[in-house]
């Protein structure tokens, strides 16, 4: 799956997910025209693409236990990507995002600069 999301789909996803946990971002990581063979692997790829874009655009920061993660955006993203589950079973109905194995959660940066810790 190379053509991840159209720009309007990305904006719709961000609008729907803003202020919510990364589990919500994963739930919304589906194209409007979902192929019949759409798999968790496809959803995972979209989620990671969206996460990286949100980080690079400054729309979210990653934090754990009330503290922002150390390192560059690239380092944080690579850390997250390296441990992100490869199967739906490993996500465990979204519980993985709240487990110690998850490197961090989303802190949304709103247009006015205020932060929403999710």
Regions found by a protein language model. Name each.
Residues 1-42, 53, 64:
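Short amphipathic alpha-helical interface segments
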Residues 6-10, 47, 73-77:
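Short amphipathic alpha-helical segments that mediate assembly, nucleic-acid/protein binding
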Residues 36-37, 43-44, 80, 91-92:
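Short secondary-structure boundary micro-motifs
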Residues 48-52:
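Short, hydrophobic-biased segments on the C-terminal half of alpha helices
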Residues 56-66:
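A short, conserved structural fragment
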Residues 70-118:
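Short, amphipathic alpha-helical interaction segments positioned at domain boundaries
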């Amino acid at each position: 799956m190379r053509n991840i999301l159209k720009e309007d789909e990305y904006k719709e996803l961000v609008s729907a997910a803003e202020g919510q946990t990364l589990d919500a971002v994963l739930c919304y990581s589906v194209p409007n025209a979902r192929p019949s063979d759409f798999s968790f692997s496809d959803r995972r790829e979209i989620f990671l693409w969206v996460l990286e874009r949100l980080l690079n655009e400054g729309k979210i920061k990653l934090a754990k236990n009330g503290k922002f993660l150390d390192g560059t955006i690239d380092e944080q993203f690579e850390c997250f990507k390296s441990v992100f589950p490869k199967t739906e079973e490993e996500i465990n109905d979204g519980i993985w995002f709240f487990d110690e194995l998850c490197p961090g959660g989303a802190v949304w940066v709103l247009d006015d600069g205020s932060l929403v810790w999710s």
